[in-house]
Amino acid sequence: MKRKIVILLGPTGVGKTELSIKIAKLLNAEIISSDSMQIYKYMDIGTAKPTLEQRKEVIHHMIDIVNPWDYFSTGAYIEIVKEVIEKIFEREKIPLVVGGTGLYLRAMTEGIFEGPDADWNLRMELMNKERDNPGFLYNLLKEIDPIKADKIYPSDLRRILRALEVFFKEKKQISELQEKLTKPLSYNFIKIGVTRERKELYRIIEERVDKMICSGLIEEVRNVLTLIKRNATSLSPLPALQAIGYKEIAGCLADLYSIDEAVRLIKKRTKMYAKRQFTWFRKEKDIMWFDISGRHDFEIIAEQIYSALSEILHK
């Protein structure tokens, strides 16, 4: 019989962090973050990491494991997570995966596409063409791989670059290659989803962004930019700097627009990201959904989820 792993998923701002800690205590679990930006060191406020106090309450994994000037693939994430999961089981605890990033979750449960290594010279060549002619790369991808282009936002240069890079190196469309996935991790995944009414979620997001600014996000971004400038070995776009909050504040610090405009953009893009997460998670199979609209009684919500989980975990 496959060992069981619990996944707690939901859109950004829904309350997963606080809820996960309470569920973990009830389950005697350790938490594994599946957030692609919480992996980066020094990026605490903008990624809404669990506080140090929260991490003392329950052991957390996959947080602060990579420098923001480094690159970290989904494949690398999975390799580390496999070891983390086994060690949690050795301690006779339950792994509680909290996310987050749909790609990480899907890689765990369904497998991952293993593409070629990054070609920085090719990426720089493509980026130079994009600078000379904005929109060039997305239009090129639409010609080469229209199926993949339909799934990527025109502004998502990192994913557009990767799709083009794979095509030029493999001579095949990434949409075709992604059908040939590696095997998923060999566990029984129990998926719990938490959601809120969209209007309420958007209000929470706006309040959270304001709180991040008041908590020192601008200074945090300035510090991260200084560290990257001092340590980065490549001029290629860094995934860490594409994180919502960091990208917009960096633009403000570069005098591209005002702080008010940066805050407006962060709120707008965070809402768009939450909407994409809704769409992504709704496509996932076998999720037990809990609508927590209007609720912040996380102790009671955790007990309700634990009650539902207990029957499944002890089968």
UniProtKB/Swiss-Prot annotation:
SUPFAM superfamilies cross-referenced by the UniProt entry: P-loop containing nucleoside triphosphate hydrolases
Sites where the protein binds substrate: T12, G13, V14, G15, K16, T17
Top-rank lineage group of the source organism: Bacteria
Site (Interaction with substrate tRNA): T101, R123
Record-listed E.C. numbers: 2.5.1.75
Enzyme class: transferase
Keyword line: ATP-binding, Magnesium, Nucleotide-binding, Transferase, tRNA processing
UniProt binding sites for ATP: G10, P11, T12, G13, V14, G15, K16, T17
Gene Ontology process terms (BP): tRNA modification
Molecular functions (GO terms): ATP binding; tRNA dimethylallyltransferase activity
Reaction catalysed by this enzyme: adenosine(37) in tRNA + dimethylallyl diphosphate = N(6)-dimethylallyladenosine(37) in tRNA + diphosphate
Similarity comment: family membership: Belongs to the IPP transferase family.
Function as written in the Swiss-Prot or TrEMBL entry: Catalyzes the transfer of a dimethylallyl group onto the adenine at position 37 in tRNAs that read codons beginning with uridine, leading to the formation of N6-(dimethylallyl)adenosine (i(6)A).
HAMAP family noted in UniProt: IPP_trans
Complex and partners: Monomer.
Name of the featured protein: tRNA dimethylallyltransferase
Organism, as annotated: Thermodesulfovibrio yellowstonii (strain ATCC 51303 / DSM 11347 / YP87)
